[in-house]
Structures are given as C-alpha cells and as structure tokens.
C-alpha cells in the first residue's frame, strides 16, 4: 500500500541548519551531507568539493555506487540536491509509479525525467527546486532552469531506454571513470 511522505524539503533544510551551526563555530570549509548536500569552501586537499551524480537505475539504493557523472561544486556556499524517482516508487499491476505527485493532477508523474540535480544558494531552495523539476518533467524543467540565472541544474532522462543528460550552462558534468 503506497504511503504519503511530506518531507520533500526537510533534508535540505536540515543541511542548512547544520551549516549555520558550523558557521557559528567558525568553520569555513564544510560539506554537510545528510541525504542532501550543503558545501562551502574547499575539501581537506584544498580543492573544490567534488560530487558524484548517481545513475538513476531502478534499485540504485547505494549512493555513490553507480555514478552518472562527476560535478565540481562552484565557489562559495551552495546547496546541491538531487531528486529522482529511481529509489522511491512502487509497482502495481506491473506498472511503475513515481513517488512524486503532480499537484495539478493529483496523480504520480509520468514522464521521461529520472533525476534532477539542482545547485542553489542553499540546500532548502535546491531541494525545493529539484522536487519541482521532478514534477514538471524534462522540457518544462529545461525552460524553467534557462529562465533562472540563480540556479544550475542537471537533468537525467530516459530516451528510448538510454540515459541522456541535459545540463544548464554553468553545470559542468564530467564523465565518471
């Protein structure tokens, strides 16, 4: 039986709260990862934070085990959040249903967009916009991101059974090794 879960931006908000606390202690270089990510500064090697974007394979429940691409976080504080339908879904009568509900229809979304990774000024906003993109679908998300210079995004979608990637101009995704 499907269950409703209302925590769409809770993890992003929690990252921001932890980051605020770390700032209050004088920490300048950080990566807060509690399901969603907030990062600022550099990693312990003095380089930009590097993140793997998970390949949206059904059942890929081990973050980092199957990587679609590598992303270097931009300078300054940012929230970096991925929403997708490859970990949270259900199957009924042989048909897969996403956990994302389109509020315009009241039904689970049905489109080719598999995951949306968003970079915003904080993790709360990134979380909200990643969820929003998962409701919009590929084409509407592309238009939305193109209209928002304050956001960067990477969309992974299914094109005839093959994973394809679309990234906004400022989101550089390198191939995973």
What are these regions (language model features)?
Residues 1-177:
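Mature catalytic core of soluble alpha/beta enzymes
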């Amino acid at each position: 039986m499907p269950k409703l879960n209302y925590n769409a931006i809770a993890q992003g908000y929690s990252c921001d709260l932890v980051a605020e606390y770390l700032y209050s202690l004088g920490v300048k270089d950080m990566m807060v990862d509690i399901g969603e990510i907030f990062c600022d500064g550099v990693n312990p090697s003095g380089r930009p934070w590097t993140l793997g974007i998970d390949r949206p394979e059904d059942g890929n429940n081990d973050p980092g085990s199957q990587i679609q691409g590598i992303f270097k976080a931009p300078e300054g504080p940012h929230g970096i959040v991925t929403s997708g339908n490859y970990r949270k879904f259900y199957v009924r009568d042989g048909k897969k249903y996403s956990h994302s509900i389109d509020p315009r229809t009241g039904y689970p979304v049905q489109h080719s967009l598999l995951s949306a990774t968003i970079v915003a000024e904080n993790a709360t906003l990134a979380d909200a916009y990643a969820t929003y993109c998962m409701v919009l679908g590929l084409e509407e998300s592309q238009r939305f991101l193109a209209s928002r210079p304050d956001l960067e995004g990477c969309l992974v979608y299914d094109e005839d059974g093959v994973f394809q990637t679309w990234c906004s101009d400022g989101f550089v995704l390198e191939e995973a090794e």
